Amino acid sequence: MSNAHAQAGLATLDSSMAERLPSVSQTLFSAKAATGITFEDMAKELGRSEVAVAGMFYGQVQASAEDVVKLSQLLQVSQESLAPLMAFPNRGHAGPMPPVEPLIYRLYEVVQNYGYAFKAVMNEKFGDGIMSAIAFNTKVEKEVDEAGNPWVVITLKGKWLPFTRF
């Protein structure tokens, strides 16, 4: 894929977020823009999900030493500059609450509107408990309907953790 072609659909760092993210995030996003590589391409090379790889860029997902080696090669940056990715993430601080970015706000709105419905259905199916966001994976897929309209499919898969009686 040419760098010019890749730039049109390439996720980049919103400069207003930069100060809230780890310093390595700027290195990652700059290298991503320079190489024109997508999260999908990186995920295939790392054997991880696109969301996990993107999460590394935002300081929300910990990278393994193997991830750092592969990212270093893919993004053409030193392994040393990516070493902070192996530290424990400081999760949950990337943006304001409630979110102000429109797409992220829509996800927040889904939980506001359907959160209790999700909870009720899960309780009926599994009992009293919660869905783990630790023993968890997620993916984003694109579907196109019969009329040619694009649809987003977000899968959230978490281990069910029943509350214990005490």
Swiss-Prot record:
Gene3D superfamilies: Cyanate lyase, C-terminal domain (3.30.1160.10), lambda repressor-like DNA-binding domains (1.10.260.40). SUPFAM superfamilies: Cyanase C-terminal domain, lambda repressor-like DNA-binding domains. One of its GO terms (biological process) is cyanate metabolic process. The keyword Membrane does not apply. CDD domains: Cyanase_C. One of its GO terms (molecular function) is DNA binding. The active site is at R106, E109, S132. It is an enzyme of class 4 (lyase). The keyword Lyase applies. It comes from the Eukaryota. InterPro entries: Cro/C1-type_HTH, Cyanase, Cyanate_lyase_C, Cyanate_lyase_C_sf, Lambda_DNA-bd_dom_sf. Keywords: Lyase. Catalyzes the reaction of cyanate with bicarbonate to produce ammonia and carbon dioxide. Belongs to the cyanase family. This is Cyanate hydratase. It comes from Verticillium alfalfae (strain VaMs.102 / ATCC MYA-4576 / FGSC 10136).
